[in-house]
Design a protein with these regions (language model features):
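Contiguous, structured surface segment used for ligand recognition
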Residues: 1-3
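Transmembrane beta-strand segments of Gram-negative outer membrane beta-barrel proteins
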Residues: 5-9
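Catalytic-core regions of glycoside hydrolase
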Residues: 12-16, 26-28, 35, 40-47, ...
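Catalytic domains of carbohydrate-active enzymes that cleave complex glycans
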Residues: 281-289, 298-300, 312-456
Length: 456
């Protein structure tokens, strides 16, 4: 495969994921490995959910907003020192809680995509608050040694306003991005604008192109088109402004298909060799310039290697990437390299894994590992989770076997989050409360009764 030009790891530090909880040395190691596989750009998004503006801090406190902001600034500095291009990703009218004055808040009726802590940018005070806050963050980042190459905007998740003045939203958002770009150039004069097409409709692409070509020609240098779940390319026929290069927004936080409830790794690490290889081939064939790889942390480590390794032209197939991955991180040689690649690939469709065989093969392969670390341990966690889940659902009624297996499942999942991935207070869609086994509610209602019985 030939290399795609722009290969961004979009790693939002939020919701208690690895990127939020990691120390500097861990971020550095992660980015060094990202570079090894082939990424050449790094992006983060300051998700304001539940946070005050960290710069609105008259008492000089160091609370959650300040801690998260320091994490992000440090990650950007590390990325720049390592030679990565840097992207400041914004959903511009999603703001901090202390900006949410009732008279300038957005309207969110009529479109399910409109959500978040939103201000109306058509209200002058709302627009001023948005622009001043973003410029303040960028200035603080620069003052503390950071550098940003691109400001990258997304209109949804979070974002939107349905008031008459903001309709159509995609145009209001586009003008807001242009204004933000002007503000950002006061801090970083050479900064350029990229866009993300997550959740855009075909009609919005048409509207945006007509507006941008007329009102903002040449401003937007690329647009990462949305690849929907289980697809391997953006919707054909999307139109872009003149001079705006086609890129893709690639979700690496699930397996080959989104058929199991473990998006974002709530049931263990993820792997999508067929989906990612076909995606890269499609992007190359259809003339795409690059991509933004949406990652939520350690669980998609293999998928990072797959996407970067293939899209950089370093490896010609997913199988070759997986062999290199096993050799690099498991310290193995010879025939075991191919066996590990085959074992890992089997988890691309987790519901089809023969758990008895997978356990036998894993125990044999693990014995040959010379450098065990978290990248290996996370896969044993995944195997254990599916083993315990299988023991539960094999029971025709809730009995001691089911209760014990369920307890082991819950313990293993917590251990994976805390001891293996070193996660913090995991929040929102990354929390496994949204992807519980079908038996979990029954377990909650029954396990105390079984525990009391066993103590009698």
């Amino acid at each position: 495969m030939s290399a795609l030009t722009y290969r961004e790891l979009y790693a939002p530090a939020h919701f208690g994921n690895f990127y939020e909880t990691a120390a500097d040395y861990e971020i550095k190691e992660m980015l060094q490995e990202a570079i090894f596989w082939g990424f050449n750009a790094y992006g983060d998004w300051f998700d304001a959910a539940d946070l005050k503006n960290p710069l609105n801090n008259p008492r000089a406190e160091f609370l959650t907003p300040q801690a998260i902001w320091e994490r992000k600034k440090s990650s950007y500095r590390i990325a720049s020192r390592l030679g990565l291009q840097t992207s400041w990703i914004v959903t511009p009218n999603h703001v901090f809680t202390d900006q949410l004055l009732p008279e300038i808040m957005a309207e969110m009726d009529g479109d399910d995509r409109f959500m978040g802590q939103l201000l109306c940018p058509s209200r002058s005070d709302g627009r001023k608050s948005i622009l001043e806050t973003q410029r303040g963050l960028l200035q603080d980042l620069k003052n503390t040694g950071g550098h940003i190459d691109y400001i990258t905007g997304c209109p949804f998740d979070y974002g939107g306003c349905s008031c008459k003045k903001c309709t159509p939203w995609i145009i209001t958002w586009g003008q807001l991005m242009a204004d933000l770009h002007d503000e950002a150039r006061e801090v970083f004069p050479d900064i350029r604008v990229r866009l993300i097409g997550w959740w855009w409709t075909d009609e919005e692409h048409e509207l945006f192109k007509a507006w941008a070509d007329s009102k903002q020609p040449g401003r937007f240098i690329s647009l990462a088109e949305h690849i929907r779940y289980d697809e391997t390319q953006p919707t054909p026929g999307i139109v872009l402004p003149e001079g705006c290069k086609p890129q893709a927004f690639v979700h690496i936080g699930y397996n080959n298909r989104n058929t199991h409830r473990d998006v974002y790794g709530t049931w263990g690490p993820l792997i999508a060799p067929e989906r990612i290889e076909q995606t890269v081939r499609n992007l190359e064939t259809n003339g795409f310039d690059g991509y933004s790889a949406y990652s939520e942390g350690a669980s998609d480590d293999v998928n990072k290697a797959l996407l970067a390794g293939l899209s950089s032209g370093k490896y010609s197939s997913s199988d070759n990437v997986l062999k290199a991955y096993a050799e690099r991180y498991f310290g193995i040689t010879g025939s075991q390299i191919e066996s590990w690649a085959e074992w890992l690939s089997g988890w691309a469709d987790p519901l089809s894994v023969n758990l008895t065989n997978a356990r036998k093969e894993f125990d044999v392969l693990k014995a040959g590992v010379r450098s065990p670390e978290w990248r290996l341990e996370q896969w044993e966690c995944r195997l254990r989770l599916f083993e315990e889940h299988s023991r539960v659902i094999e029971q025709k009624e809730w009995n001691e076997i089911a209760n014990t297996a369920a307890e082991r499942f819950v313990l293993e999942r917590d251990r994976m989050y805390r001891e293996v991935w070193k996660l913090g207070l995991v929040r929102h869609v990354l929390n496994y409360r949204y992807s519980q086994p079908e038996w979990f509610a029954h377990y909650q209602s029954q396990h105390e009764k079984f525990n009391r019985s066993s103590e009698m």
